[in-house]
Amino acid sequence: MQITVREALRDAMQEEMIRDDKVFVIGEEVAEYQGAYKVTQGLLEQFGPKRVIDTPITEYGFAGLAVGAAFAGLRPIVEFMTFNFAMQAFDHIVNSAAKTHYMSGGQVKCPIVFRGPNGAASRVAAQHSQNYTACYSHIPGLKVVAPYSAEDHKGLMLTAIRDDNPVVFLENEILYGHSFDVPKTIEPIPFGQAKILREGSSVTIVTFSIQVKLALDAANFVQNDNIDCEVIDLRTIKPLDTETIIESVKKTNRLVVVEEGWFFAGVGASIASIVMKEAFDYLDAPIEIVSGKDLPLPYAVNLETLALPSESDVIEAVKKVCYYSI
């Protein structure tokens, strides 16, 4: 059976709204229009306007309302049309949702999911293309999820909605329409468990979200040169499955990290730091990080392509750590 990522997310929200009447969806155009990317399709008809709530264009307003509802015991799912617009709600996410459980000595919980597309799509320019994975992962009190497959989107969304504290669920606009094989039943997937999608012995490639496809395609390409890549899909960035990464590096002795976001203070830099500390003696080559270029993403399609990680970038990094002549 195959379903799209869009359907997987919708099914997860639908199941949790049936299971728990405290769950509700709020955001711009989530009700009548059924979501900017049709992720909330059919939910208004099934659950009504009290649980699927259209809002004005005011992220600061509806995010704050949702955080307050979570403090009061409800379980909001906040949809941002894009995480670029969540910048307007950053104060509520960081200073209220993420910190209150700690500041209250564990007395106040904030069971809320902030979800929507993150990162580049196709020619939506610099202000609509930023990747916030590293930004949110930097903040104590937030769990950060960035899946690739439909099964993982659904399983991790089920877990996110049931979590008693805030989860930032980073989706990808291009992935919404992608179809994946899924089992008949998808159970909640625990946070902090990476998935080895391809076993190998020559080099470890660690990545997440839509970059997983780049990694798999690159791994298949270099197989022709007898380079056997192990590809790890992180699925959750925080908590990070450090153990799976370290054990893989101990086996392959080489590491390439692929992320769409910027290099400086990025996810790749954090992973490289951890591996250098925990598995330095196992490394046979310097760690390579493939990332987006250090500039606002251009609108022109040729420049946009050059600014984002590509399959050839991953292939070059893999060959470099294997000391293979390029």
UniProtKB/Swiss-Prot annotation:
Quote the EC number.
1.2.4.1
Tell me its cofactors.
thiamine diphosphate
Residues that bind thiamine diphosphate: 59
Question: What are the protein's UniProt keywords?
Answer: Oxidoreductase, Pyruvate, Thiamine pyrophosphate
GO terms, molecular function:
pyruvate dehydrogenase (acetyl-transferring) activity
Reaction(s) catalysed (UniProt annotation): N(6)-[(R)-lipoyl]-L-lysyl-[protein] + pyruvate + H(+) = N(6)-[(R)-S(8)-acetyldihydrolipoyl]-L-lysyl-[protein] + CO2
Report the Pfam families cross-referenced here: Transket_pyr, Transketolase_C
Task: Say if the entry is tagged with keyword Oxidoreductase.
Answer: yes
Q: What does this protein do?
A: The pyruvate dehydrogenase complex catalyzes the overall conversion of pyruvate to acetyl-CoA and CO(2). It contains multiple copies of three enzymatic components: pyruvate dehydrogenase (E1), dihydrolipoamide acetyltransferase (E2) and lipoamide dehydrogenase (E3).
Assembly and oligomerization: Heterodimer of an alpha and a beta chain.
What protein am I looking at?
Answer: Pyruvate dehydrogenase E1 component subunit beta
Native species of this protein?
Rickettsia conorii (strain ATCC VR-613 / Malish 7)
Species classification = Bacteria, Pseudomonadati, Pseudomonadota, Alphaproteobacteria, Rickettsiales
